Every structure is written in C-alpha cells, then in structure tokens.
Swiss-Prot record:
The keyword Signal does not apply. This is Bowman-birk type proteinase inhibitor. One of its GO terms (cellular component) is extracellular region. GO terms for molecular function: serine-type endopeptidase inhibitor activity. The record marks T41, R42 as: Reactive bond for chymotrypsin. Coiled coil: none annotated. Inhibits trypsin, chymotrypsin, plasmin and factor XIIa. Does not inhibit factor Xa, thrombin and plasma kallikrein. Keywords: Disulfide bond, Protease inhibitor, Serine protease inhibitor. InterPro entries: Bowman-Birk_prot_inh (IPR035995), Prot_inh_BBI (IPR000877). Disulfide bonds join C7-C61, C8-C23, C11-C57, C13-C21, C31-C38, C35-C50, C40-C48. The keyword Transferase does not apply. The record marks T14, K15 as: Reactive bond for trypsin.
Length: 63
C-alpha cells in the first residue's frame, strides 16, 4: 500500500455516540493524506501529528 494512504497504528476513541477518535501516530515530514489539521516540529526530519477528530479509525499502517 502507498505510504501516503490514510492509515493509523495508534488510534484512540471515546465511548460516546458517535465516537470521537484521534490518531496518535508520529510521522516524519508530513501527516497522512486525509489529515486536515497537521502539526509538525521544526526538527529535521520534522515529526508530524494529525489533530483531526473523526468518528472512526483509519486502517492500521503496519499490516
């Protein structure tokens, strides 16, 4: 699978309905392709994390 495809290994959801899920993965230089709210450190390489809240988890990246 493409490394740019949206995926997440460490996803956490609340038990509410609908659930509120977020991905805790740290990626180098960019967030996954579906991320709208991405924050990166200024280090080289940059460590980026997606802060989107969704009602689902993306499929795992490592498979």
């Amino acid at each position: 699978s493409s490394k740019w495809e949206a995926c997440c290994d460490r996803c956490a959801c609340t038990k509410s309905i609908p659930p509120q899920c977020h991905c805790a993965d740290i990626r180098l230089n960019s967030c996954h392709s579906a991320c709208e709210s991405c924050a990166c450190t200024r280090s080289i390489p940059a460590k980026c994390r997606c802060f989107d809240i969704t009602d689902f988890c993306y499929k795992p990246c490592s498979g």
